[in-house]
Design a protein with these regions (language model features):
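Hydrophobic helical membrane-anchoring modules
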Residues: 1-3, 175-248
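Acceptor/aglycone-binding surface of glycosyltransferases and processive sugar-polymer synthases
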Residues: 66-67, 73-84, 103-180, 207-215, ...
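Short beta-strand-to-loop acidic/aromatic patch adjacent to the donor-nucleotide binding site
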Residues: 86-100
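Short, well-formed alpha-helical segments that are part of the catalytic scaffolds
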Residues: 15-29
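Cell-envelope/extracellular polymer assembly enzymes that use nucleotide-activated donors
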Residues: 6-8, 34, 185
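Conserved short acidic donor-positioning loop in nucleotide-sugar-dependent glycosyltransferases
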Residues: 15, 40-42, 69, 78
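Acidic helix N-cap motif at the loop->helix transition within catalytic regions
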Residues: 19-22, 44-53, 104
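A conserved acidic beta->alpha catalytic loop
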Residues: 39-50, 67, 99-100
Length: 253
């Protein structure tokens, strides 16, 4: 088994409840010993979860945002922290705090990352009958748009479980976006920057139909689709301009 002591868990959280405690307990049980927990501007009544966990577990490093900056900002903050404070790091794994990522799956993604040197996406099976309709529709739609407009085959575009080798952290810390759109921009960066990625099948878990998610279906989905379409048109126009220059140059010969 690969050594997980040099892989940092990146765990952003906003207004947590007891599920965050279960996530941390599971990660520790499965051998993770470096957890970077980010309080992304939580309400005062939720802050005790962060303080209690950090006091109980020396494996936890606690980062604070005084105001909510967004999931993307929290992830990038943690990536920069690892780059500055974990010189021997082999990578990170991003995990959501709603207890929908089983720690065994988290470990499997990390082990595959260490074996292949690729970014590993933990991908759910949306054909399962207990998947909420909005989640099934949203993920299938986004996967289809990625396939058609970007040329990337990704079975779970909205997964928050991502194991990332340390060699790519600097690049991904500079990717644009501070909120949920950052995770989409990260996937587009794989395409633009030639970052290799692979998938790992994981459990499909939805607790109370994902009611604890801070993802706003219409608002955040539209922001994601705009990013993908903008990426498509940017590259299409670039290709057309390049072709026009080639044709113009040829006509002068």
């Amino acid at each position: 088994m690969n050594d997980l002591s040099r892989v940092s868990v990146v765990l952003p959280s906003l207004d947590p409840d007891d599920k965050l405690v279960a996530v941390v307990d599971g990660l520790l049980e499965y051998g993770f010993s470096d957890i970077i927990l980010i309080n992304d501007g939580s309400k005062p009544e939720n802050l005790h979860y962060f303080h209690d966990l950090a006091a109980q577990h020396p494996e936890i490093t606690l980062l604070h945002h005084e105001v909510n900056k967004g999931k993307g900002a929290a992830l990038k903050n943690a990536f920069r922290y690892v780059l500055q404070n974990r010189p021997d790091s082999l990578g990170v794994v991003t995990v959501d705090g709603d207890n929908q990522h089983h720690p065994e799956d988290t470990r499997a993604c990390c082990e595959k990352m260490l074996e292949t040197g690729c970014v590993v996406l933990g991908c759910r099976d949306f054909s399962q009958p207990d998947v909420p309709p909005r989640s099934r529709f949203g993920n299938r739609t986004t996967s289809a748009i990625f396939k058609v407009f970007v040329g990337m085959t990704i079975s779970d575009t909205q997964t928050g479980l991502r194991a990332i080798p340390a060699s790519y952290l600097n690049q991904l810390a500079e990717v644009y976006g501070d909120r949920f759109e950052y995770e989409t921009n990260m996937l587009l960066a794989f395409k633009d920057q030639g970052i290799p990625f692979d998938e790992q099948k994981i459990r499909t878990v939805y607790i109370e139909e994902n009611k604890s998610s801070h993802f706003r279906v219409i608002h955040d989905s539209w922001r994601i689709y705009k990013l993908i379409l903008a990426h498509f048109f940017r590259y299409t126009l670039s290709s057309l301009a390049s072709a026009a220059v080639d044709i113009g140059g040829y006509s002068l010969l």
